[in-house]
């Protein structure tokens, strides 16, 4: 493999994408300096270290021709699968999930990198399996993509990490729909979503005379079931299952239009807000900087999505296009779920906000994904 950047690649560097990403990273570190202010451990310094490592990794990814990455998609995918399996034997358990490898003071979450592995492998499958005379996928051709998705989805789900499993599922579904599927499969998917909604309504919303085992509750872990209950009716148990959602909405709502000011947030300062440097980092931002700056942050995320889709539409091959769509889908669904969770529209799932939340594995995986977008854009006129 050759590591190089040629002069003719430079005009195709997506500077808008890079600026938007670095702007969100800078706002994230600034926000973490407030979320982790004394007397608590200041994590923003560690996040700066992780950012430095991540930027170095992005530069390395940009130096490699992404056609070599295409050839390595299967080994990358299999390596991540093996890491997920190894978690069952050597993983570190925290917050009820066996999701991390602990190496001294550092922890690594393989599921974060599995998301990239799934995107790369799906892109390779759709590139290699392309048939000009049959562009859309029926059930007989769809088994390969579904198998690629099912194995990591199941391994992450049994950790149990429902949030990350859902992110793998949603980003993969976006890629599969982008790859064109037959209309009857889309109709089946819509029916399945409606059926799932009916089941959840039956389990959690419809009043029943006495507690009873139901379809969803029987298969979910206790804390997962409590999160759904707390989402649907947070006021029913404000000190238990509804605590996270209630405190988060108080923080977001109290920020008003312009916010309370940096390090002036009461929910943050008094530590009422749980996981405020990770899952609920957007609540800190909303309380201290208000509605206007929340819009600024959303505009930056929107710019990342638009520039990323532009990379996909201008890619010179199917692999590059599918990788770009997969990366954008992965980031979009993660932002959608995290902010939806913070404002009470979606249940709490433990999903972090890309580039804003504290965490080395999360930041590195997102930046590697951005590196893939930059790589594809730089080489769109190379072959």
Tell what function each PLM region has.
Residues 1-9, 64, 194:
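N-terminal secretory targeting signals
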Residues 4-21:
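N-terminal membrane topogenic signal
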Residues 18-34, 38-240, 283-341, 368, ...:
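Hydrophobic alpha-helical transmembrane segments of multi-pass inner membrane proteins, especially
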Residues 86, 153-159, 254-258, 337, ...:
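Transmembrane alpha-helix interface/packing and boundary motifs in multi-pass membrane proteins
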């Amino acid at each position: 493999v050759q590591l190089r950047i040629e002069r003719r690649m430079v005009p195709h560097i997506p500077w808008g994408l890079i600026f938007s990403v670095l702007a969100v990273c800078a706002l994230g570190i600034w926000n973490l300096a407030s979320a982790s202010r004394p007397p608590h451990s200041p994590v923003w310094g560690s996040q700066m270290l992780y950012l430095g490592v991540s930027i170095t990794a992005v530069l390395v990814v940009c130096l490699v021709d992404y056609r070599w990455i295409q050839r390595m998609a299967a080994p990358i995918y299999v390596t991540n699968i093996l890491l997920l399996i190894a978690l069952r034997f050597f993983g570190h358990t925290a917050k009820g999930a066996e999701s991390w490898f602990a190496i001294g003071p550092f922890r690594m979450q393989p599921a974060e990198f599995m998301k990239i592995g799934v995107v790369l492998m799906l892109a390779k499958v759709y590139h290699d399996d392309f048939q000009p005379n049959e562009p859309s996928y029926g059930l007989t051709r769809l088994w390969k993509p579904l198998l690629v998705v099912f194995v990591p989805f199941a391994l992450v789900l049994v950790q149990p990490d429902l949030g990350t499993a859902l992110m793998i599922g949603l980003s993969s579904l976006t890629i599969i729909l982008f790859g064109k599927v037959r209309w009857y499969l889309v109709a089946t998917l819509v029916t399945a979503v409606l059926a799932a909604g009916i089941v959840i309504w039956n389990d959690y919303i419809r009043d029943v005379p006495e507690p009873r085992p139901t379809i969803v509750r029987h298969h979910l872990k206790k804390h997962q079931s409590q999160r759904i209950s707390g989402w649907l009716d947070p006021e029913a148990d404000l000190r238990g299952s509804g605590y996270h959602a209630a405190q988060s909405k108080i923080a977001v709502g109290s920020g008003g239009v312009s916010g309370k000011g940096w390090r002036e947030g009461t929910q943050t300062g008094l530590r009422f807000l749980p996981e405020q440097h990770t899952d609920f980092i957007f609540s800190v931002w909303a309380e201290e900087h208000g509605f206007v700056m929340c819009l600024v942050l959303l505009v930056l995320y929107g710019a990342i999505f638009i520039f990323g889709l532009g990379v996909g539409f201008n890619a010179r091959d199917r692999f590059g296009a599918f990788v770009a769509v997969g990366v954008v889908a992965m980031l979009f669904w993660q932002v959608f779920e995290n902010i939806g969770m913070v404002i009470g529209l979606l249940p709490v799932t433990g999903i972090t906000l890309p580039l804003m939340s504290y965490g080395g594995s999360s930041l590195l995986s997102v930046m590697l994904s951005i590196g893939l977008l930059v790589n594809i854009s730089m080489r769109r006129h190379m072959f």
